[in-house]
Design a protein with these regions (language model features):
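VWA/integrin I-like adhesion module and closely mimicked acidic/polar interface patches used
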Residues: 143-191, 209-210
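Surface-exposed acidic, glycine-flexible loop patches that form ligand/cofactor-binding
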Residues: 11-13, 39-40, 71-75, 128-134, ...
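Loop/turn elements at helix/coil->beta-strand transitions in domains of secreted/extracellular proteins
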Residues: 77-82, 132-139, 165-172, 191-195
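C-terminal "exit" segments of structured domains
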Residues: 190, 198-231
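Acidic, polar low-complexity linker/tail segments
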Residues: 1-48, 53-61
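Von Willebrand factor
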Residues: 40-95, 100-142, 147-148, ...
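Extracytoplasmic/secreted envelope proteins and their assembly/folding machinery
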Residues: 18, 44, 61, 65-72, ...
Length: 231
């Protein structure tokens, strides 16, 4: 049994133990309840990178490639790395060990450059891929932050963030241009417990995975013996 505990402000509640849970079945206490652990105990995370394929991002080829490699290195060969390219239609480009992108270049992407980027579909695809992933999970988008090419034709911002939160997926953004983050991206970051990072910062991105691991989850796993008859 997996349980997500939040307060009335939808903030995760962490630090709970077995005595904090009381399980019933048909209004009767269940037998042999066992506390299996909390997601906050995980020391690694599954990460999905979304790479912006809009035309203006091609001016920042080196910065995007550096960001991909730094995030992969920060994972320290723990967890699964996924790479999705966000163009007119999102494409899953890679699933595997973080070391698999150590020679990553934009030329290896199958998705062509596009004047229209379906960000909503890319975020939906990334979230779907993480539903059955490790308990610590995050989407990281790498982009210039210019949303003139972005479209949200199928899912609005509230639907996107709600779907992420319901599946315990946080969202962070790596900015490769020195400009302010758009209001749309800021909304998603702020409503999914994520962070904004600049590729230009002196320390680089080496702490990004540790930051994700420290995000409160409020997800717990328990087991019990059912007294209901089996079919």
């Amino acid at each position: 049994l997996e349980i997500k505990v939040e307060n009335r402000h939808r903030q995760p509640v962490v630090g709970l133990q077995e005595p904090n849970f009381y399980l019933t079945e048909n209004k009767r206490p269940v037998n042999k309840v066992k506390f299996l652990g909390a997601a906050s105990n995980n020391d690694f995370a599954d990460i999905t990178l979304i790479i912006d394929r809009s035309s203006n991002c091609q001016l920042y080829k080196n910065e995007i490639e550096t960001a991909v490699k730094e995030v992969a290195a920060a994972m320290e060969e723990k967890g699964t790395l996924r790479v999705i390219s966000a163009g007119a239609i999102p494409v899953t480009e890679y699933i595997g060990k973080p070391s698999g992108v150590q020679n990553f270049t934009l030329e290896t992407l199958k998705n062509p450059v596009s004047e229209n980027v379906s960000v909503d579909l890319a975020l939906r695809l990334a979230t779907n891929d993480l539903i059955n992933a490790e308990k610590k999970r995050s989407i990281i988008m790498i982009s210039g932050g210019n949303t003139n090419n972005y479209s949200y034709s199928k899912y609005n911002l509230a639907e996107i963030t709600s779907y992420m939160n319901n599946n315990s997926v946080c969202f962070s953004f790596i900015q490769v241009m020195q400009n302010a983050l758009s209001s749309e991206m800021s909304y998603i970051v702020n409503n999914t417990c994520g962070e904004l990072y600049y590729i230009f910062r002196p320390e680089g991105l080496k702490n990004i995975i540790n930051d994700i691991l420290e995000i409160p989850q409020g997800v717990y796993q328990l087991s019990y013996t059912s007294s209901l008859p089996t079919n």
